[in-house]
């Protein structure tokens, strides 16, 4: 299956101060994809979907792993020469080739494994610097810029002055996302009017819904499941602590009936009932 994406021609990269740094083109998607599939640069983060859904991606990853530190010098051009199924015929066209039929690939390509990355920024920060970049050093191309980031506390956003859709949408002048370690604390912050929206724990939701006079009943909104799927990733060549093959496990997991036992008896309706109690 071949998927062709046509990109906008009016997207710019800006820094944390809103200053335009460079123009975004299809090359940035090639640079970003090579980074993700390079074992040395990316350290294997978020490689599963590209490995499974793009021709040659898994082989390229294995190649970079074999190269070790030498993989640091590879570029997107090396990835293309290796035969990975992604190409950019022009500045605003991106083509992916899947090993099998993948009618949902457009949703796969929206995942962060396929995000663009500016080559100039990587060259400026270096591999270690890009891997560790924060809100002050990264570049942006979306509707907002992260003005302030306090680890484990808050993320504050302001509008990107060069956002391509600025004239077509309404944006907050500034908004802050509070990171919560305990959702009960989140409920308290909501009650104190310090938050505009919060997810509720099941116990809190039960307390509210069991009391028809509770004032928060009128403020409840249904929480719809997000787009996701479950999967099992099995190790078919497990070793014991001494390095010898675990013959019992390897023989069992090779059996289809054994693998099916992991999910055949799953009953997910109680889970969904709790996830969407309203």
Language model features with spans:
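Surface-exposed intrinsically disordered loops and tails
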Residues: 1, 17, 42-83, 127-135, ...
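RNase H-like, two-metal
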Residues: 1-9, 86-87
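Long alpha-helical, hydrophobic tracts
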Residues: 1-2, 115, 126, 274
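Alpha-helical scaffolds flanking conserved acidic
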Residues: 2, 95, 257
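Extracytoplasmic/periplasmic ligand-capture domains
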Residues: 5-42, 138, 143-275
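Gly/Pro-rich hinge or "lid" segments in bacterial periplasmic/extracellular proteins
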Residues: 70-75, 79-83, 89-93, 97-176
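A generic local secondary-structure boundary/capping motif
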Residues: 84-85, 262
């Amino acid at each position: 299956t071949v998927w062709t994406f046509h990109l906008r021609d009016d997207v710019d990269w800006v820094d944390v101060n809103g200053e335009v740094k460079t123009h975004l083109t299809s090359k940035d998607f090639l640079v970003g994809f090579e980074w993700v599939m390079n074992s040395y640069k990316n350290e294997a983060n978020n490689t599963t979907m590209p490995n499974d859904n793009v021709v040659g991606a898994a082989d390229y990853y294995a190649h970079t792993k074999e190269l070790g530190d030498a993989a640091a010098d590879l570029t997107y051009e090396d990835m293309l020469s290796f035969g990975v199924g992604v190409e950019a015929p022009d500045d605003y066209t991106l083509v992916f080739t899947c090993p099998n039929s993948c009618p949902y690939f457009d949703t796969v390509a929206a995942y962060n494994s396929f995000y663009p990355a500016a080559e100039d920024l990587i060259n400026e920060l270096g591999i270690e610097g890009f891997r560790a970049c924060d809100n002050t050093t990264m570049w942006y191309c979306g509707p907002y810029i992260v003005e302030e980031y306090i680890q484990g506390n808050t993320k504050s956003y302001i509008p990107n002055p060069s956002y391509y859709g600025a004239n077509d949408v309404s944006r907050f002048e500034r908004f802050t996302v509070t990171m919560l370690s305990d959702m009960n604390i989140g409920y308290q912050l909501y009650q104190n009017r310090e938050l505009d929206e919060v997810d509720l724990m099941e116990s809190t939701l039960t307390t509210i819904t069991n009391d028809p006079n509770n004032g928060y009943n009128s403020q409840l909104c249904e929480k719809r499941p997000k787009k996701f799927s479950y999967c099992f990733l099995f190790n078919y060549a497990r070793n014991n602590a001494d390095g010898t093959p675990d013959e019992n496990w390897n023989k069992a997991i090779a059996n289809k009936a054994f693998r099916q036992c992991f999910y055949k008896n799953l009953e997910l309706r109680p889970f969904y009932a709790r996830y969407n109690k309203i």
